[in-house]
């Protein structure tokens, strides 16, 4: 009689990120299956909040993202890829406050003050993270508007202003 041995491996976060193609392809590792399932249930606000955990600007990226997740989507082998980027946009568009909302509760203030130079996506993201960690943050920007290349490099027909 042949003895067969099996090895059980519990899938952790790193396994999921490596083996779910859309998750592995996303530069910020957004929980794509998680927010799509919430949209399917009609829970747009939960989908938006889940998306915002990995990405401070889901309403913007739902419009301009290069969506490498769609190129990696396994569904394309059956018919066509899931419209992941459009679903991200839908979650933001259906959010009652229009896509603005707290990602995590603010922590009690710390006395240390920090400055962030540049109000582009990276500067605003780090300022958001630091403020939510309780630091007092001031953002400096040379341009007359915040947003960096989002505001001055992307045409208004692609990303609406105001």
Segments from the language model and where they lie:
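Conserved beta-strand elements of the Class I
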Residues: 115-117
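Ferredoxin-type iron-sulfur electron-transfer modules and their immediate structural context
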Residues: 1-113
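Beta1-alpha1 glycine-rich phosphate/pyrophosphate-binding loop at the start
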Residues: 29-41, 48-51, 55, 77, ...
């Amino acid at each position: 009689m042949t003895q067969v041995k099996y090895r059980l491996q519990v899938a952790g976060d790193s396994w999921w990120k490596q083996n779910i193609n859309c998750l592995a392809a996303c530069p910020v590792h957004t929980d794509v299956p998680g927010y799509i399932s919430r949209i399917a249930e009609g829970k747009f606000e939960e989908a938006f909040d889940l998306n915002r955990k990995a990405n401070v600007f889901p309403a913007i990226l739902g419009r301009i993202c290069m969506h490498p997740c769609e190129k990696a989507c396994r569904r394309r082998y059956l018919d066509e890829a899931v419209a992941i980027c459009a679903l991200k946009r839908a979650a933001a568009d259906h959010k009652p406050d229009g896509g603005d909302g707290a990602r995590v509760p603010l922590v009690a203030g710390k006395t240390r003050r920090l400055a962030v130079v540049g109000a582009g996506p990276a500067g605003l993201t780090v300022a958001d993270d630091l403020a939510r960690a309780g630091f007092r943050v001031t953002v400096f920007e040379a341009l007359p508007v915040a947003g960096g290349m989002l505001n001055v490099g992307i045409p208004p027909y692609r990303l609406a202003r105001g």
